[in-house]
């Protein structure tokens, strides 16, 4: 893509620097102001989006002679004639962008797991010995289950420990190890169910009466107490409750530029999937309900350093010019005075040229009304700890079954059905364990496969995104669960032009925050048709006085494939 409009003031600045390079030290302070006006906005919601471009250049020479500062101002008025500038639909969204509250004590969970592992190992050995000596299939089954619990607890403890470790190879670190641990816990439970069922069927065929039922009854009671203690100890960690606000990691991956031209070495890049996920460009959603041809993919990255920190939004506009002297840095102040953009653009480009890769970092959320923050606490299920809790629950049922079967044998030794009660109750235990195991495997498996959260309508989300000013189409939308209630969203959207992208990205982030989405990745593609409909009014001002008549420049013929 090429934009041929010349920035004559920049060339003049370059010539002045060449003349004075060997004679003086010169400070050039130039300010460019750009006003973006959409002619299609509703009169009741007319907003003049202001973008100020500042350029400061320091040039030092060998001479000690100085001259007075020179201050030039270039005013660009961009008139947007595209059909995506109305605020009526956007107003219906009632965007708030409230930060998501979340807190969880990993240290407390680790301590609880260590205590539970120690007690479970000791009692597992005690149950196994008692089951063999007393010929109790329920006791042996419970000891097998305890052995599976030991493995599950070790997996849970390991996952929680490594989940907080940083990683340079994994996009989200080891945080998904919790979900993986929950999946393996479910597999362990399924294995135990098969073993218990097999032993119980064999005991029905070959009947064996429990010997020393009193000892079995006492051991079962101790096991019940241990399991109840573990369930109570971990029940406070199975969910994390809203309380403190936290930073959001908006480290977004970006797409790719479909350009046949040979780019520089510095600009050539593939996919940088910092978040560990890719994008496909099928399933396009046009805001007008029509399919449009693909445009040049202009790649963006959206991430936030902290939801409550005062940080700036940064945009780097990359070009293909080999001459580094033809690159200038501009500082753009966005619609919100707290939001800023750092840009690097080619001198030959208009302020809103189409060949660029945009990287938007954080937009401050200090302007949010803290009194409007969510007071409703959201329960966040930790799949890994929830899996351990299910193990302990089934163990508690197992201990109850052991006590029932041993109690009947102890108090009714002549009752013939008491011999069959032990294996029958063991089959019931296996059935309960199997049900909980299937649910756990299904839940963790869905999260590992990045399934869309239940109850979220992607088509409605696409329609809402198209209501935001400057968004013309949603090319691709993916929403999935990282772990617990940490939901990730990746949206490939078509934007009218770069002038409205920072504001649109800020509103898209707020929209997803209102949905409870933890992290948002935005990949923009700028519309050629909207770019061509823009008109730019250029006026040069020196010391507050206009020295040139406004010149109307149309971008219609400036963009060539």
From Swiss-Prot:
Residues 246-270 are annotated as: 6 X 2 AA approximate repeats of H-G. Residues 1-20 have a biased composition (Basic and acidic residues). GO terms for molecular function: protein kinase binding; zinc ion transmembrane transporter activity. Expressed in intestinal cells. Expressed in the vulva. Residues 134-136, 198-215, 413-420 are extracellular. One of its GO terms (biological process) is detoxification of zinc ion. It is found in: Basolateral cell membrane. It is a multi-pass membrane protein. Residues 1-112, 158-176, 237-391, 442-561 are cytoplasmic. Residues 247-264 have a biased composition (Basic residues). Residues 1-26, 240-304 are annotated as: Disordered. Keywords: Cell membrane, Developmental protein, Ion transport, Membrane, Repeat, Transmembrane, Transmembrane helix, Transport, Zinc, Zinc transport. One of its GO terms (cellular component) is plasma membrane. Pfam families: Cation_efflux. The chain crosses the membrane at residues 113-133, 137-157, 177-197, 216-236, 392-412, 421-441. Its main location: membrane. It comes from the Eukaryota. Interacts with lin-45 in a zinc-dependent manner. Belongs to the cation diffusion facilitator (CDF) transporter (TC 2.A.4) family. SLC30A subfamily. Involved in the regulation of Pn.p cell fate determination. Involved in zinc metabolism and the decrease of the cytosolic zinc concentration which is thought to modulate Ras signaling. Involved in zinc transport from the intestinal lumen to the pseudocoelum. This is Cation diffusion facilitator family protein 1. The gene is cdf-1.
């Amino acid at each position: 893509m090429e934009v041929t409009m010349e920035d004559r003031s920049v060339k003049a600045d370059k010539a002045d620097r060449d003349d004075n390079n060997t004679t003086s030290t010169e400070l050039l302070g130039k300010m460019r102001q750009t006003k973006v006006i959409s002619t299609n906005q509703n009169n009741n919601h007319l907003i003049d989006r202001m973008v100020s471009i500042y350029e400061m250049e320091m040039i030092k020479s060998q001479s000690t002679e100085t001259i007075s500062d020179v201050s030039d101002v270039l005013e660009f008025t961009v008139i947007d004639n595209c059909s995506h500038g109305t605020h009526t639909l956007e107003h219906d969204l009632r965007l708030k962008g409230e930060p998501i509250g979340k807190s969880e004590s990993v240290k407390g969970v680790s301590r609880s797991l260590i205590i539970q592992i120690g007690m479970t190992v000791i009692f597992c050995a005690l149950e196994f010995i008692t089951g063999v000596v007393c010929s109790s299939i329920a006791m042996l089954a419970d000891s097998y289950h305890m052995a599976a619990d030991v493995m599950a607890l070790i997996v849970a403890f390991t996952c929680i420990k490594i989940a907080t470790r940083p990683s340079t190879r994994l996009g989200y670190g080891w945080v998904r190890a919790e979900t993986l641990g929950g999946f393996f816990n479910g597999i362990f439970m399924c294995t135990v169910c098969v073993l218990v069922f097999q032993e119980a069927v064999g005991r029905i065929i070959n009947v064996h009466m429990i010997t020393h039922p009193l000892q079995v009854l006492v051991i079962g009671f101790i096991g019940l107490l241990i399991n109840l203690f573990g369930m109570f100890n971990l029940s406070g960690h199975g969910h994390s409750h809203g309380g403190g606000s936290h930073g959001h990691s908006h480290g977004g991956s970006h797409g790719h530029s479909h350009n046949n031209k040979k780019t520089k070495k510095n600009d050539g890049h593939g996919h940088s999937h910092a978040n560990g996920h890719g994008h496909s460009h099928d399933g396009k959603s046009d805001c007008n309900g029509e399919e449009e041809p693909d445009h040049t993919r202009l790649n963006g990255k959206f991430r936030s350093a902290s939801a409550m920190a005062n940080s700036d939004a940064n945009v780097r506009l990359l070009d293909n010019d080999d001459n580094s002297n033809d690159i200038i840095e501009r500082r753009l102040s966005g619609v919100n005075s707290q939001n800023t953009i750092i840009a690097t653009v080619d001198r030959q480009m208009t302020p809103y040229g189409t060949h660029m890769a945009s990287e938007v970092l954080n937009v401050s959320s200090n302007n949010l009304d803290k009194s409007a923050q969510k007071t409703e606490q959201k329960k966040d299920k930790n799949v890994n700890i929830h899996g351990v809790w299910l193990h302990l629950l089934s163990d508690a049922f197992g201990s109850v079954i052991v006590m029932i079967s041993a109690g009947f044998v102890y108090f009714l030794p002549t009752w013939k059905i008491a011999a069959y009660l032990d294996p029958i109750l063991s089959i019931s235990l296996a059935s309960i364990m199997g049900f909980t195991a299937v649910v756990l495997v299904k839940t963790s498996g869905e999260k590992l496969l990045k399934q869309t959260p239940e109850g979220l309508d992607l088509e409605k989300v696409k329609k809402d995104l198209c209501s935001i000013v400057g968004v013309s189409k949603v090319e691709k939308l993916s929403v999935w669960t990282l772990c617990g209630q940490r939901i990730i969203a990746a949206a490939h959207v078509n934007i009218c032009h770069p002038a409205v992208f920072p504001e649109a990205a800020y509103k898209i982030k707020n929209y997803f925050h209102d949905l409870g989405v933890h992290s948002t990745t935005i990949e923009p593609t700028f519309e050629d048709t909207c770019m061509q409909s823009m008109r730019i009014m250029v006026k040069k001002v020196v010391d507050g006085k206009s020295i040139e008549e406004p010149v109307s420049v149309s971008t219609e013929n400036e963009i060539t494939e």
